[in-house]
C-alpha cells in the first residue's frame, strides 16, 4: 500500500472534483489525489468509495487531507466516526436485487450505467 508518483491528466482548475474508487484501505492514495486536485486549482474534492476498509491511520489521513467529504457504503462497518465520512446504506439495493432474483427478473439494469 505505497504510493509512487501521481500525475493529473486533464484540467481541474475551477471545478468541483469527485474521485471514485471501489475501496479505500489505508487512505494514502485518496488523500494524495485530493491534495493534488487542490494544488491544481480544484474548488473542492469529494470521494465516493464502495468499500471502506480504513485500516491503520486511514482516518487520520482522511481528516488531514483536503477531501471535503468521503461517501462510503455500509458494506463494511466503520471503526470510528469522522465528520468527513458519510455512510450510505446498500441494504435497499440488496433487498431489491434479492426480490428480483426470487421473481426470476433480470438484475442487469441495477448494475449497468
Where are the regions that the model predicts?
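PRPP-associated nucleotide enzymes
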Residues: 1-113
Amino acid at each position: 500500500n505505497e504510493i509512487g508518483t501521481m500525475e493529473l491528466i486533464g484540467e481541474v482548475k475551477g471545478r468541483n472534483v469527485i474521485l471514485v474508487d471501489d475501496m479505500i484501505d489505508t487512505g494514502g492514495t485518496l488523500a494524495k489525489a485530493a491534495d493534488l486536485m487542490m494544488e491544481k486549482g480544484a474548488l473542492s474534492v469529494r470521494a465516493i468509495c464502495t468499500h471502506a476498509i480504513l485500516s491503520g491511520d486511514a482516518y487520520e489521513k482522511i481528516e488531514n487531507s483536503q477531501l471535503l467529504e468521503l461517501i462510503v457504503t455500509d458494506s463494511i462497518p466503520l471503526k470510528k466516526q469522522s465528520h468527513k465520512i458519510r455512510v450510505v446504506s446498500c441494504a435497499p439495493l440488496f433487498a431489491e436485487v434479492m426480490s428480483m432474483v426470487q421473481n426470476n427478473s433480470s438484475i442487469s439494469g441495477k448494475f449497468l450505467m
